[in-house]
Amino acid sequence: MALLGKRCDVPTNGCGPDRWNSAFTRKDEIITSLVSALDSMCSALSKLNAEVACVAVHDESAFVVGTEKGRMFLNARKELQSDFLRFCRGPPWKDPEAEHPKKVQRGEGGGRSLPRSSLEHGSDVYLLRKMVEEVFDVLYSEALGRASVVPLPYERLLREPGLLAVQGLPEGLAFRRPAEYDPKALMAILEHSHRIRFKLKRPLEDGGRDSKALVELNGVSLIPKGSRDCGLHGQAPKVPPQDLPPTATSSSMASFLYSTALPNHAIRELKQEAPSCPLAPSDLGLSRPMPEPKATGAQDFSDCCGQKPTGPGGPLIQNVHASKRILFSIVHDKSEKWDAFIKETEDINTLRECVQILFNSRYAEALGLDHMVPVPYRKIACDPEAVEIVGIPDKIPFKRPCTYGVPKLKRILEERHSIHFIIKRMFDERIFTGNKFTKDTTKLEPASPPEDTSAEVSRATVLDLAGNARSDKGSMSEDCGPGTSGELGGLRPIKIEPEDLDIIQVTVPDPSPTSEEMTDSMPGHLPSEDSGYGMEMLTDKGLSEDARPEERPVEDSHGDVIRPLRKQVELLFNTRYAKAIGISEPVKVPYSKFLMHPEELFVVGLPEGISLRRPNCFGIAKLRKILEASNSIQFVIKRPELLTEGVKEPIMDSQGTASSLGFSPPALPPERDSGDPLVDESLKRQGFQENYDARLSRIDIANTLREQVQDLFNKKYGEALGIKYPVQVPYKRIKSNPGSVIIEGLPPGIPFRKPCTFGSQNLERILAVADKIKFTVTRPFQGLIPKPDEDDANRLGEKVILREQVKELFNEKYGEALGLNRPVLVPYKLIRDSPDAVEVTGLPDDIPFRNPNTYDIHRLEKILKAREHVRMVIINQLQPFAEICNDAKVPAKDSSIPKRKRKRVSEGNSVSSSSSSSSSSSSNPDSVASANQISLVQWPMYMVDYAGLNVQLPGPLNY
């Protein structure tokens, strides 16, 4: 029986017989029994090829029964359930004054509850109600001609229907309390908010003196708004006449309304941080006088209001924009509803705006101001001792809100009431200007306690910090570009940040993990080399591209510090590597080889938490740590032959060494003419191939790192289950069952998820703490142990070993095809993109040639049985590996580098045999064409289905 049992809080309207009252104590059991019988009848009908879909509603519960297809139909169309439930309760959207006047009186405090069957998240309904309440308050204030927002007196207006006329409500809706509307009605009101008008038929006698203004037009108060009183009592503060033009008093609030959101892709392009200046009338949309909207009004709002909600079952916060007042209430009000809203919502834009409001408000409180001011993030990052941030959750660095993800934003908002800023001293201007000046004796010393300072110094500090925090309204948005400048000093003659919105700020000199995490916010998941080059390019080139002359000392000072450190570390690595291979002069370290073979090629003596990477990937703190431990750093090479696999760049210092590696360096004339086109073309071609191969090697490194992390997670998960071999981690089921599996030991700031979602830098950080990672299963759940296959139940651990053996076989055969007496790593991606370049014979008939990671255990066994017959023949030389051997054939002149496309393989997706490069596929042009159309990057462990975990293996395995 498929039982939803969603309880609804809507009071019944007498839809059921009186005998189903609560006086009948066993009515729930009888109803459940009858529904079960109904489900049995549906099962019997399904055996006769009949399909049934049934919705049963009783009191506060809804039941869905039927055949399998019928239940799928109803579950996919939950609006049918909610419509039927409302139909049983009576016609929707009726005027409560005519139908149920007593219920209106009774619900004035909290209102009637809404049927939850039409909405999954109660906190989203709460947000919609607050937004509709804001709309009504603004329209009522406009009708009064007030410059401030006045709460609408629902009790009096509903008691005297002739007092207020409401026009423009959606068809079928009557004016009542927002708490009495259902979610669809709330969304309809928000969609038509620009058409709604309030008109007072007769003036209120006490409305002028008893209305309470909640939000002034010159800014939002930092005091939490709290609960709102619907009655007409409370004194309204006087509004200065200069705060608002006379022409803007009556109709200027019309733009302070709500509408449904734009599509998700358009939302991402919008600015994602709230305005960090004091909320002026322009920020609330109240400063621009608007005429009475007619046809033009509907046209202006057509883009915002044309989108319908995706469905009543989804979280409606994805489909609405919350006003700044609502967001301010979320941040400052201590309400369980807002706490539930923060936990349930996944809208990153709303969360970022809330965190931005939180930081700006707390910073203003620290300055003693009564309005929000923008936080000078760059100044705090460069001079962290000036401002202390208290209460931020552990392992979350203080950064711009646009650099946080959803989990960190939620954690910050959960601790929002305990977060505070403490101003310790003024910012050291030498950090931002690079000038050396005599320190003013009136300024606060860093080491002196705050109580030793005079009131004048404190006042000067506040004015300086507040003045630096303010900026021109034209450039005040500070919205979501990670390097956006929000603290451009409006009163200062020198800009301290560039205007380019696309620059990522990575100039943090302290040893905090901010600079490393900023690289994760760069577009895409770059490998470690890309991250290093990207950071260097952005800091050294991008930041100074549009900078003024007086700004350049700031960037030069930071670059002057980090560049020599990088050169020293690079020289250190090259010297230690040359010593390990027996060469006296420094040799460039093949970082990719060390990352691809961590067991045979590694480095000892590095500081704790630092792995071998290019020096460009390190910040100042880690570079200094490496130099401090320079005497203990040593390169260990267990298998020297790995260094010669796939190497194209010979060591030009020694001809004998180059020859021993199987290369013949190009014989250039001693005096070459710079204008020789042949020489220039050969040099260009060589540089192009080097860049192309470097890109391929970085991709291979990233794939290798992901495979290693995946193997690590599978191994740790198997250990948590008490099994001695790896087990495929059920990521989706672990995510859907929070708390069932606890993962400990991950680096700070790295959440547990699929390795394919990490960049190379985070993958390296995970591998660096592999010994500390631990899985703990706290409670079982469905899918904890995958269902075993019939044939593979007893042989799951063997697949890893067989796969490595097939890899070694293919590498050996590929080396023989190149005319070398050693194994060579097979370029599976290049062969897949050019299936005619290499012909593989001797494989079993039903097995195409591809990456061994994609084979199942049966195919791996068949290949190993036929290993003596496997042969590889190179027909057309692969371009990036053209220099790997001396006897390779010269490629055709018109051959071009194949374009590669990367697609990730989803879980359980089988790789089609169209990527085969065997003789059968080379003779079939259709299969070759399909192979060129679909280019896949195989993630090896994601296609492994470890099952039968409680079955003993026949013997010990050396994993």
Swiss-Prot record:
InterPro entries: GTF2I, GTF2I-like_rpt_sf, TF_II-I. Residues 96-106 have a biased composition (Basic and acidic residues). PROSITE patterns: GTF2I (PS51139). One of its GO terms (molecular function) is DNA-binding transcription factor activity. It comes from Homo sapiens. GO terms for cellular component: cytosol; nucleoplasm; nucleus. This is General transcription factor II-I repeat domain-containing protein 1. One of its GO terms (biological process) is transcription by RNA polymerase II. Keywords: Developmental protein, DNA-binding, Isopeptide bond, Nucleus, Phosphoprotein, Repeat, Transcription, Transcription regulation, Ubl conjugation, Williams-Beuren syndrome. Residues 910-923 have a biased composition (Low complexity). The N-terminal half may have an activating activity.
